[in-house]
């Protein structure tokens, strides 16, 4: 994921 959407992805547990 991108750094800009890192928190977004982390929040959605995409990682």
Swiss-Prot record:
It is found in: Secreted. The keyword Secreted applies. Keywords: Secreted. Its main location: secreted. It comes from the Eukaryota. GO terms for cellular component: extracellular region. This is Placental protein. It comes from Ovis aries. The lineage of its organism: Eukaryota, Metazoa, Chordata, Craniata, Vertebrata.
């Amino acid at each position: 994921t991108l750094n800009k959407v890192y928190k977004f992805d982390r929040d959605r547990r995409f990682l």
